Amino acid sequence: LEDFIFIILIYNNFIKKYIPVLPNNFKPFKSNKQNLIRVGPKRDGGYIIDKRIIKKSKTIITCGLNDDWEFEKNYLQINPECNVIAYDHTVNKKFWKMRFKKDFLALIMLKKLTFNKILDVFKYIDYKFFFKDKNIHFSKKIVQKKNKSHEVSIKEILNKKQNIILKIDIEGDEYKILGAVNNECHKINLLIVEFHNISKNIGKIKKFLSNSKFKIIHLHANNYGGIDKFNNPNVIEVTLINSKKFFVNKKKSTKKYPILGLDYKNLKRREDIRLKFND
């Protein structure tokens, strides 16, 4: 019996040490299994959505683009009537020149040998083909309050818009605009946010959730970010649905995260991050 108790204690210590424990209000609400689908690649850049929003959502607004629009591209294959409006002040001519130079050098030095990596060298061509006609990229910085011509606020972005999918990945600046997002919640069907530096900003996320009509329906730890000294993932990908527009079960999910067959590693060569919640 003593040996058994000792093993249990060792196991519990292992769990506490290696599996991040997030606050209970981060735990997703229960969703019907058939409603959750993955859009985008089975790697970094893919996200989970509720398929109930597809026919009712006509525009994806992407805040933070970098060089990845696979989610948007895949979504348009599912719903061709949708359009994409993206904002990212860092994606400009200088960005593409530096990226092409880096990728081309990697190619001639035989560091890019897979088909997909070779295609990446010509990413700019894909960018020009995708962002034309109904799909637009604005090289503007997303801010809480606009002061300069190259800046844009959430209120301005969502002006005269309805039934939006809003996707935010702006490397830590998301916390500055959460209040504005809540103020415009009646225009948004689905919200996808990458939260960065979780331990530092956990209070801000809790406040946002407590004051919001958006309810978490899915959560995944981005293994690119790893785990911090407080045993929290540094980056989490969160999908929230507007509970004023779509039914949300009041019960919390009992699923284990990541969800097999739905979630995939952002970085393939690194273990995915399992999550627990304070019940």
Give the label of every model feature segment.
Residues 45-47, 69, 151, 175-178:
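Short, well-ordered alpha-helical scaffold segments within catalytic/effector domains
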Residues 59-61, 71-86, 97-98, 155-279:
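Conserved acidic-Pro-Pro-aromatic motif
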